[in-house]
């Protein structure tokens, strides 16, 4: 559903195998839910789209983690969430045929929006619906829902190296990949590893724009 503003790194050069050779990546488990949620919450705190979509009248970001936790728990039903080191970065994928959340998590998301976001809850839920409507369905693919680098480790290329690690695995299966970029500054970085613009949509009533991107099978 969301790819954020946390990666401030140069474009990848060299082959994917060269880029990932020194990266310590492990598969996340249910026991890592707190850590993954923390990384995503911190990395998206100032994202152009999600900071706007979850802004409460009184300010504050303490509630953000409750929303991201649902996405993390939904993704951890599959073996496609990855962590770098002790929590430097994380990537969250939904494999072909999977869903972002279980039905009970989707219901809880709607309840949480009403409880935490007050007058902007409707716009938030409409935004989520726009993500779903824009998602391509014709061809099975891997779906990058979230990619974030912990703020303490930004600027070192870790996020893009993690993405390269993931794409190496996906390429081994000769499968396409899809993501949504909520920060225009990241679009060129995704293009550097083979993603192409697919479409776009905006925040309800005007505001930040999301670019959808597709990477053909290799």
Which residues fall in each region the model found?
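Conserved GNAT acetyl-CoA-binding A-motif
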Residues: 140-143, 169-182
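Conserved beta-strand-loop-alpha-helix junction that forms the acyl-donor binding cleft
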Residues: 145-154, 178-187, 204-208, 215-217
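Conserved active-site alpha-helix within GNAT-family acetyltransferase domains
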Residues: 160, 172-174, 183-200, 206-207
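A short beta-loop-alpha structural element at the N-terminal edge
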Residues: 24-38, 42, 46-47
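Conserved acetyl-CoA-binding loop-helix of GNAT-fold acetyltransferases
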Residues: 149, 155-168, 192
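Conserved acyl-donor/pantetheine-binding loop and adjacent beta-alpha core of acyl/acetyltransferases
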Residues: 90-150, 154, 204-205
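Active-site rim helix/loop that mediates acceptor-substrate recognition in acyltransferases
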Residues: 57-80
């Amino acid at each position: 559903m969301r790819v954020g503003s946390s990666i401030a790194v140069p474009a990848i050069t060299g082959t994917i195998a060269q880029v990932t050779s020194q990266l310590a990546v492990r598969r996340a488990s249910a026991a890592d839910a707190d850590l993954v949620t923390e990384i995503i919450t911190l990395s998206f705190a100032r994202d152009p789209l999600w900071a706007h979509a979850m802004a409460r009248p009184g300010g504050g970001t303490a509630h953000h983690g409750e929303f991201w936790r649902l996405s993390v728990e939904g993704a951890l039903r599959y073996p496609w969430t990855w962590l770098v080191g002790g929590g430097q970065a994380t990537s969250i994928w939904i494999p072909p045929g999977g869903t972002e959340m279980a039905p009970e998590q989707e219901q809880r998301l709607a309840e949480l929006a009403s409880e935490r976001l007050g007058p902007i809850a409707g716009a938030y839920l409409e935004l989520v619906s726009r993500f779903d409507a824009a998602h391509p369905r014709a061809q099975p693919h891997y779906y990058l829902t979230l990619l974030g680098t912990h703020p303490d480790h930004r600027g070192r290329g870790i996020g893009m190296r993690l993405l390269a690690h993931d794409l190496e695995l996906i390429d081994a299966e000769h499968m396409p990949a899809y993501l949504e970029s909520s920060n225009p500054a990241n679009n060129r970085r995704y293009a550097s590893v083979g993603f192409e613009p697919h479409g776009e949509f905006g925040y309800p009533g005007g505001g930040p724009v999301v670019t959808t991107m597709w990477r053909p099978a290799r």
